[in-house]
Design a protein with these regions (language model features):
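Transmembrane alpha-helical segments and their cytosolic interface motifs
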Residues: 10-28, 135-161
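Interfacial loop-to-transmembrane junctions
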Residues: 185-210
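Residue-level signature of catalytic and energy-coupling elements of molecular machines
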Residues: 20, 59, 108, 152, ...
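Structural signature of hydrophobic alpha-helical transmembrane segments
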Residues: 169-181
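Juxtamembrane boundary at the C-terminal end of a transmembrane helix
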Residues: 217-228
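Alpha-helical transmembrane segments of multipass membrane proteins
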Residues: 52, 56, 155, 159, ...
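Cytosol/matrix-facing amphipathic helices and coiled-coil assembly/linker segments
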Residues: 1-6, 66-148
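Internal alpha-helical transmembrane segments
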Residues: 1-66
Length: 228
């Protein structure tokens, strides 16, 4: 169960990083390209966006995961105090939990009694069944930040790469095409774990990219009028 949770957490960072990198970079450089049409400015802006946002997203992932770990540790410490100071009440809670899980009443009483006689086992049972947390929460904050950082860079480079090889107009079109394809593949790939319909999730990702293109295009068209 914990192994599955670790895979899901890692997948979340990877998918979020790739998706956000593709969508935000595509929207930004599309808008900048329409407003400026300066090839150097487009590439420089894309590189700056990818560099800054990848670090920002990695820091955000690290802090978010650290916060979750600290909250989980606090909950475990609190439960440890309750088990030590209120053993009868906690034992009754454990009995009730076992009954709710479908165990016969007599067996639930015996199971709670046996667990309460072993402080370590008692705490593990309460944390696992009442809090639904691991007794010793694993800290994957650095790993999550690493996945987010790398995924965002990879995702951000996808819409930017065409600008390194083609002029603005064809590069913009290729950027949109490869990013839409990348989003569709990413959405389809996630269904190998989620079990959803691959085409449905893929199209959902493409629609998100389409929103970014529209926003970038509107900003690129309207900003010269507003500024100048």
């Amino acid at each position: 169960m914990l192994k599955v949770k670790k895979v899901v957490d890692s997948l979340r960072e990877i998918v979020f990083g790739l998706e956000d990198g593709m969508v935000s970079t595509l929207g930004a450089i599309t808008g900048i390209g329409i407003a400026s049409d300066n090839h150097y400015v487009i590439i420089l802006s894309g590189l700056v966006i990818i560099s800054v946002e990848s670090v920002s997203m990695a820091v955000g992932a690290y802090l978010a995961n650290r916060s979750v770990i600290e909250v989980e540790k606090k909950e475990v410490r609190q439960e440890k105090k309750e088990v030590a100071n209120q053993p009868k009440e906690e034992r009754q809670e454990l009995e009730d939990i076992y009954r709710q899980q479908g165990w016969p009443a007599a067996l639930a009483i015996d199971m709670a009694r046996v667990a309460s006689e072993n402080p370590k086992l008692f705490l593990e049972e309460m944390v696992t069944h009442e809090l639904r947390l691991p007794v010793r929460p694993k800290d994957h904050s650095i790993l999550s930040a690493f996945f987010m950082f790398c995924s965002y860079i990879l995702g951000g480079l996808i819409p930017l790469l065409p600008y390194f090889f083609w002029s603005n107009a064809p590069a913009r079109l290729l950027s949109i095409i490869v990013t839409m394809l990348g989003l569709f593949i990413l959405g389809s790939w996630t269904t190998r774990i989620t079990g959803q319909r691959w085409w449905k999730v893929g199209m959902r990702m493409v629609l998100l990219g389409g929103v970014a293109i529209v926003i970038g295009w509107l900003v690129g068209r309207l900003s010269p009028l507003a500024i100048g």
